[in-house]
Regions:
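Glycosyltransferase-associated regions of secretory-pathway enzymes
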Residues: 1-53, 69-198
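Small-residue hinge/turn detector
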Residues: 55-66
Length: 198
């Protein structure tokens, strides 16, 4: 489990943009995971706590709406919430080429534009884009568990539920969701504590 101290300065700063925040417990997430039978069957076999946390953030926002921000994510400016129906994503980075991606990550040329999984939000309960992302995570998780690597590498974790999932689904399906908004990198800064890494 997470052992690093929570960077409260980011949380305090972000309250100026989103005054009502809540902390979600493991119990809350486990209850939501039961809504996806394939995920429920895999849940106790998930090999690393950060995978549960990454899937948990998607589940929570899918079922409740609102925004998710990593605790080490700092909002730089007001996020536009002008629409009655929107799914907001943030650009994580733009790579020079896809050869910098991990061995399993999607190498389609458009995937140089990486979508962040450390921040996203919607004002739509059960937004279908998030459903597609969750289903992609479950598919990758099942593959990883069934292939049974002797040692779970950081690249495995990133592929299962990290930014490659939301990036892949964004590029594959963005035209299906007219309310999908991708904001540029000027809205957030991510301190990238990555305390889950070995």
């Amino acid at each position: 489990a997470e052992n690093s101290p929570i960077p409260t300065s980011c949380i305090d700063h972000n309250r100026t943009f989103f005054p009502e925040m809540n902390v979600v417990s493991v119990t809350d997430i486990e209850r939501l995971a039961k809504s996806f039978p394939d995920l429920e069957n895999l849940w106790d076999r998930i090999p690393h706590w950060i995978i549960k946390a990454d899937i948990g953030r998607l589940l929570y926002i899918y079922f409740h709406g609102n925004f998710y921000f990593d605790v080490d994510c700092r909002i730089r400016k007001k996020i536009p919430l002008d629409s009655e129906r929107c799914m907001i994503l943030f650009t994580e980075m733009i790579l020079k080429d896809v050869n910098r991606l991990g061995p399993r990550e999607c190498k389609n040329p458009e995937n140089v534009l990486r979508v962040a999984n450390y921040a996203f939000g919607t004002n739509v309960i059960k937004h279908p884009f998030l459903h597609e992302v969750i289903m992609e995570c479950i598919k990758r998780l099942a593959f990883l568990i069934e292939s049974g690597p002797s040692k779970l590498e950081q690249l495995d974790i990133l592929w299962v539920c990290g930014p490659d999932v939301i990036t892949t689904v964004y590029h594959r399906s963005k035209n299906l969701y007219p309310d999908l908004i991708l904001l540029d990198m000027s809205y957030l800064s991510h301190l990238c504590h990555g305390s889950w890494r070995d």
